[in-house]
Amino acid sequence: MKNLILAIESSCDDSSIAIIDKNTLECKFHKKISQELDHSIYGGVVPELAARLHSEALPKILKQCNEHFKNLCAIAVTNEPGLSVSLLSGISMAKTLASALNLPLIPINHLKGHIYSLFLEEKISLDIGILLVSGGHTMVLYLKDDANLELLASTNDDSFGESFDKVAKMMNLGYPGGVIIENLAKNAKLKNISFNIPLKHSKELAYSFSGLKNAVRLEILKHENLSDDIKAEIAYAFENTACDHIMDKLEKIFNLYKFKNFGVVGGASANLNLRSRLQNLCQKYNANLKLAPLKFCSDNALMIARAAVDAYEKKEFVSIEEDILSPKNKNFSRI
């Protein structure tokens, strides 16, 4: 029975393939190969290196799931947004597979995929507020009853996750910065350093992390010798201020929209400090908090496969001749 969808994710520095049963939503296969160690020496993702590593990793993963090929009904792939050369690696493989197996091709928006990480084994729920925090994006969305997405707030500059990476790089801590900063902050012995919460007195429903990032840079310059204790203290102050900023604007949004359900997605949503604060906020406003499983917060192909199930039902197919590469976020107004 041809009821399986194979999905490919390669938008940044994770090579991933998943296979899902479109009828039961059962995950039949999922594998991810991370490039974090390869990019860590550079303090961030190097696009050309990422593309080369994708071209090596994706075929290796594909060989591990070829037993399912006979039951495939479609091929899905992340086509936007992301690094052009990384996206192209996955798209090229997807088109080759779709052509060779004579299957329909389904392009999936990466951010929609993150939203579906909340509903990997269940039907998607509408009328829900969503905080998306990742290395490339910070936004608050409202998924309405009619499946339209309303953007309530976004960042004017750096994203939440990106700011963690950049602060980690300033202190020569490595990449990715999210986990490094979070773990370092837990070891802070002193807590005398503080930073101002960005846009604290602004009515604008927006985020901005560039000023906070610069404040951290200036704090680092004050210290001739950046000891481990000082690094931990800076990490603690930065993480808490970044989370304060997220929560400050979220509280204003909650007051306006009175969410009954609220979800949190994206790689940076794995931050335990942020998760704890979100739980408190939802309790305060009697909202049900829905969290993506920690394993599937970061980029993965299973969320792309899950999004593809609904896209398959709507017959959102494209020709393999069509240019579907879209590094910018163009198709993100409706689920």
UniProtKB/Swiss-Prot annotation:
Cofactor section: Fe(2+)
Amino acids binding substrate: 132-136, 165, 178, 271
Catalytic activity line of the entry: L-threonylcarbamoyladenylate + adenosine(37) in tRNA = N(6)-L-threonylcarbamoyladenosine(37) in tRNA + AMP + H(+)
Example of a GO cellular component annotation carried by this entry: cytoplasm
InterPro entries: ATPase_NBD, Gcp-like_dom, KAE1/TsaD, Peptidase_M22_CS, TsaD
Cofactor binding, per record: Binds 1 Fe(2+) ion per subunit.
This enzyme's EC code(s): 2.3.1.234
The UniProt record lists the keyword Nucleus: no
Keywords carried by this UniProt record: Acyltransferase, Cytoplasm, Iron, Metal-binding, Transferase, tRNA processing
Family as reported in the entry's similarity comment: Belongs to the KAE1 / TsaD family.
Role, per record: Required for the formation of a threonylcarbamoyl group on adenosine at position 37 (t(6)A37) in tRNAs that read codons beginning with adenine. Is involved in the transfer of the threonylcarbamoyl moiety of threonylcarbamoyl-AMP (TC-AMP) to the N6 group of A37, together with TsaE and TsaB. TsaD likely plays a direct catalytic role in this reaction.
Protein name listed in UniProt: tRNA N6-adenosine threonylcarbamoyltransferase
